[in-house]
């Protein structure tokens, strides 16, 4: 097994990416931060994306938070997912920012959500709060694409949520909408407003929204992965 190495170039193919990710499994965040020469924050309250930034150093990711995937040349998106001692996800997973205007004629097939979730490298990370940040270990990664059933679940929720946005109902959408995909505000502060369509078709200002995968979607996905590892 390779030891963790900081990569400044993107992986040439999917297998190379998986091998880079596998080399991180079992290491804790303090060890990896030391190798990458990245300061370890006291906690993630002000540095929510820090783990992703750290792992990108070892994986050679390039896209950041752009609409394209993290590894555009090979069509793979990186998602870190905090898990508890049972391997269950501790929180929802951000997919992408939701477009609140200019949505006439938009389809699931051409959506950012579908594009981002077409091929995902999931990296589980210990996330229980009683474990100090530096001692949290990286889990075994998996590369995943949605099954037909999973894609259908995602499409149904996406279409329902987008219909509400287009019909000027964005402010009535709650986190309870959607079986596996939810829409909720994504802003560090409540002053960051963006334009949307109001109830009567008028322009309004509202908080930016993001699409998130619910734990009911990611939990069985991870459970299958960990079951395969133990067999």
From Swiss-Prot:
UniProt entry keywords in alphabetical sequence: Cytoplasm, DNA damage, DNA repair, Endonuclease, Hydrolase, Nuclease
UniProt cross-references to Gene3D superfamilies, sorted A to Z: DNA mismatch repair MutH/Restriction endonuclease, type II (3.40.600.10)
GO cellular component terms given for this protein: cytoplasm
UniProt cross-references to InterPro entries, sorted A to Z: DNA_mismatch_repair_MutH, DNA_rep_MutH/RE_typeII_Sau3AI, DNA_rep_MutH/T2_RE_sf, Restrct_endonuc-II-like
MF annotations from Gene Ontology: DNA binding; endonuclease activity
Main localization of the protein described in the UniProt heading: cytoplasm
Location within or outside the cell: Cytoplasm
Pfam families hit by this protein: MutH
CDD domains named among the record's database cross-references: MutH-like
GO BP field: DNA modification; mismatch repair
Lineage: superkingdom: Bacteria
Keyword Nuclease: yes
Record keyword Hydrolase present: yes
Family of the protein in this entry: Belongs to the MutH family.
Chain's role: Sequence-specific endonuclease that cleaves unmethylated GATC sequences. It is involved in DNA mismatch repair.
Name listed for the protein in its UniProt record: DNA mismatch repair protein MutH
């Amino acid at each position: 097994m390779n030891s963790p190495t900081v990569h400044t170039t993107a992986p040439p193919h999917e297998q190379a990416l998986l091998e880079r990710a596998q080399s991180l499994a079992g290491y804790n965040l303090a060890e990896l931060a030391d190798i990458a020469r990245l300061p370890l924050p006291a906690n993630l309250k002000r540095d929510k994306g820090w783990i992703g930034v750290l792992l990108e150093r070892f994986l050679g990711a390039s896209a950041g938070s752009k609409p394209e995937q993290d590894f555009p040349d090979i069509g793979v998106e990186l998602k870190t997912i905090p898990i508890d001692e049972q391997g269950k996800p501790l929180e929802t997973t951000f997919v992408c920012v939701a477009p609140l205007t200019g949505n006439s004629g938009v389809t699931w097939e051409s959506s950012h959500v579908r594009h981002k979730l077409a091929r995902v490298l999931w990296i589980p990370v210990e996330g229980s709060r009683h474990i100090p940040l530096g001692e949290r270990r990286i889990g075994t990664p998996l590369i995943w694409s949605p099954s037909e059933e999973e894609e259908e679940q995602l499409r149904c929720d996406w279409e329902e949520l987008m219909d509400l946005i287009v019909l000027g109902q964005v402010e009535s959408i709650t986190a309870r909408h959607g079986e596996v995909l939810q829409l909720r505000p994504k802003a560090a502060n409540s002053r960051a407003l963006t334009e949307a369509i109001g109830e009567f078709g008028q322009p309004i200002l509202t908080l930016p929204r993001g699409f998130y995968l619910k734990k009911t979607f990611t939990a069985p996905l991870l459970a299958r992965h960990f079951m395969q590892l133990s067999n």
